[in-house]
Amino acid sequence: MRLKMLHFARVAVGTLLLPLSAFGWGQTGHRVVGQIAENHLHAEAAAAVQGILGDESLAMCANWMDHIKSNRAYNHMNPWHYCTIPDGLTYETCDHPEEGDVIGTINQLIVEIQTKTFLIAEDEAMAVKMLAHLVGDLHQPLHVGNGTDKGGNDRKIKWFGESSNLHRVWDSDLIDHQQLSFTEYVAWVDHATAEEVSVWQRSSVVDWAQESQAIRMGIYPPAEATSLGYSYNYDHIATLNKRLLQGGVRLAGILNELYAKPTKKKK
């Protein structure tokens, strides 16, 4: 409890610098990441995760960290959904908030599962649920904010004539525009080659953030643009889909490292 209160007290300062609306991918996007991860688990890891989560799948628990935002007891977790890397800086060269960020939280959760000593998570099930969500968040380019516009939340825009903002466009508007269920979406995008899986899973959590930072630089519409629609979807949907796929593959990589021997791939 003392740890939670300490984090809670620091949130007010940290949220001045970081994106305030941080729901990551919308519900469909997070479920896509979770299901892709399940598809790439080794058999031993799949059994271990099922034993930890019970009847809940990775796809269905991947939104847990957004759902608990309605419970003020978990407000200290709000800054853990994102990080800030200003233009021209790297994660190593920029300041990091005391209350934590998505990169530090992912790394801490991995350590807690490895050691079975839970500090920021209450237990192993919560740690797995948090990983399922936060790995997805980090692959949403605007969850690596530039420190000036709350991760694109301040960039107001119309999406097919409806009021939105750039953060929301990437969280959910682009995904919802495809009019697919999460299982249909997974069937569409989950086609990584063995080489891609290997390369993506070898990269570090900081690498993932710096990928998002690089993508972020190219997804802002011109300053004079007031509405987005078909052309923006055409230009960016392949990038978004790749980030969903990478998030799922990398989540599977973490869970395989934690719970499986590398030779035992799920059939």
Region annotations inferred by a language model:
Residues 2-13:
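Bacterial N-terminal signal peptides that target proteins for export
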Residues 23-134, 141-267:
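N-terminal, motif-rich segments that launch catalysis or mediate targeting to/interaction with membranes
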